A protein has these predicted regions:
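Nucleotide/phosphate-binding catalytic cleft detector across ATP-hydrolyzing
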Residues: 1-16, 20-204, 222-224, 233, ...
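Glycine-rich phosphate-binding loop of actin/hexokinase-like ATP-binding domains
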Residues: 201-242
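A short helix-loop
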Residues: 208, 216, 248-256
Length: 258
């Protein structure tokens, strides 16, 4: 019997490309309906796609496997984006009103739009995490409706090299797989594993991958910092091989003794 009520997602990493399809139950839990993966170590390094043709082939294979398990076609997939060069950059935009007035939604929208125009050389803004707004030296989480004459919007822009997103989109286009939406992988992970109390009280989430380690910091339910370090599990394996050990044995030793 064909499965019709589902959502599909694909995440690309240095070691593998994973695809999953599932549905949300009435109690809020997620039921996994299909799963597939392909090795990506030969064409994705530090989370960055270096061979679009091979990536497209892997995406096609994963999509076909998911469709076979679902006995249905997949129209669109949600895609997690991460990898080296992904990081956060702070920015502030200020406005001064002619006289004290009420901060409107239109003014806030205009400040948000101006933030997106900040020059970033070869980087592009993938998403924005608004921090706070300062109105006449008083911090406000929601400035709309507050009286004041001077407003500063503080933003945390999530940026990456333009090629990171471009190569990913080219790979999906070549595989003829339509992207429903691009999700920042570390943020999606944080939303899945961190509790509201942890995000509010303040915590750091460290995701240790094959070629990279991603650090995300939260405070007051807001992302405060994100960075991807070009070091991962494979780095440890390579260090062990320097002791005149084969890579396969080094990997086994690492996994066995941590």
């Amino acid at each position: 019997m064909a499965t019709t009520d589902f959502i599909a997602a694909i995440e690309l990493s240095s070691s593998k490309i994973s695809g999953i399809a599932g549905k949300k139950n009435s109690d809020g839990s997620i039921q996994v309906l299909a799963y597939a993966r392909e090795d990506a170590s030969s064409f994705i390094h530090k989370g960055v796609i270096y061979n679009i043709d091979k990536t497209a082939q892997a995406l096609t294979s994963i999509t076909n496997k998911l469709e076979n398990q679902l006995n249905n076609s997949i129209a669109k997939v949600y895609v997690g984006i991460g990898g080296q060069s992904l990081r956060t950059v702070k920015n502030a935009v200020s406005r001064t009103l002619d006289e004290e007035g009420i901060i409107s939604q239109e003014l806030v929208d205009s400040i948000c739009d101006e933030n997106l125009e900040v020059p970033l050389a070869d980087m592009s803004i993938l998403d924005v995490a608004p921090q706070e707004y300062k109105i006449d030296n008083t911090l406000q989480a929601d400035p709309v409706g507050v009286a004041g004459q001077h407003i500063i919007g503080q933003f945390l822009n999530i940026v990456a090299r333009a090629s990171l997103k471009k190569n990913l989109e080219h790979s999906f286009e070549q595989a003829k797989v339509e992207i429903a939406d691009l999700l920042i992988a570390p943020i999606a992970l944080a939303n899945a594993v961190l509790t509201e109390n942890e995000m509010r009280s303040g915590c750091a989430l460290v995701d240790f991958g094959a070629d990279t380690t991603t650090i995300s910091v939260y405070k007051n339910n807001i992302l405060r910092y994100l960075s991807v370090l070009p070091l991962g599990g494979n780095t440890i394996t390579r260090d062990i091989t320097s002791l005149q050990m084969e890579e396969q044995d080094a990997e086994k030793l690492k996994l066995q003794y941590g």
